[in-house]
Regions:
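Detector for a conserved hydrophobic position within an alpha-helical segment of the HATPase_c
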Residues: 4-6
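Glycine-rich ATP-binding loops of the HATPase_c
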Residues: 9-15
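Glycine-rich GHKL/ HATPase_c ATP-binding element in histidine kinases
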Residues: 20-22
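Disordered, acidic interdomain junction associated with two-component signaling
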Residues: 25-54, 140
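Charged docking surfaces used in two-component/phosphorelay signaling
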Residues: 64-72
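Acidic, metal-coordinating helix/loop segments flanking the phosphotransfer/catalytic sites
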Residues: 79-97, 138
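Acidic catalytic/metal-coordinating carboxylates
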Residues: 81-85, 106-112
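Alpha4 helix (beta4-alpha4-beta5 surface) of REC/receiver domains from two-component response regulators
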Residues: 108-119, 125, 130-151, 156-161
Length: 169
């Protein structure tokens, strides 16, 4: 939550009362300016060419968000809920790109999953996604060949750019 608040340049007000508990109020900046563009996608958004993407995340809502955004961008999306399911899927199927959540519980995290994927598909393109800061395990995944690190929360512009860059390299 704190990372999201910081990303949006907001702040948190906390009030505690021993008898009533704690109240957290989240504040985010807003604008009163009307949108002047009428485009569904800004010029910064790079659309897909129906490439296949496997999204691996243990949180159903995160899988759904990524799937909806990528679908709008013209990608063919498959989602799975664990590293183990991703490896099983890739034993039987090909995909142009894998987007791996770094922190998954229980089971393999993004780094362990990527190591398993490399054993069966050594040239698999992948992106690591996380809502947390870039850790040593993320850096290790990048050293092993993960092409990009994508910070959550996803935005249309951010995910479109990172996915397109990885697919094009």
């Amino acid at each position: 939550v704190w990372g999201t608040v910081q990303d949006h340049k907001g702040y948190i007000d906390i009030q505690s009362d021993e008898n009533r508990g704690t109240v957290f109020e989240l504040y985010f900046p807003m604008t009163r300016k009307a949108r002047t563009d009428r485009q569904v996608f800004s010029h910064d958004v790079i659309r897909g060419r129906n490439e296949s993407i496997l999204v691996v995340d243990d949180i159903p809502e995160q899988r759904e968000i990524a799937s909806q955004i990528l679908g709008r961008l013209n990608y063919a999306v498959t989602t799975v809920s664990s590293g183990e399911k991703a490896v099983a899927f890739l034993r039987e199927n090909d995909t142009d790109l894998v987007i791996l959540d770094m922190i998954m519980d229980p089971g393999m995290d993004g780094l362990d999953t990527y190591r398993e994927i490399l054993a069966i598909k050594p040239n698999q393109k992948a992106i690591i996604a996380s809502g947390y800061a870039e850790t040593d395990r993320v850096k290790t995944a990048l050293d092993l060949g993960v092409g990009r690190y994508l910070k959550k929360p996803y935005t249309l512009e951010k995910i479109s750019r990172v996915v397109r860059q990885e697919l094009d390299c």
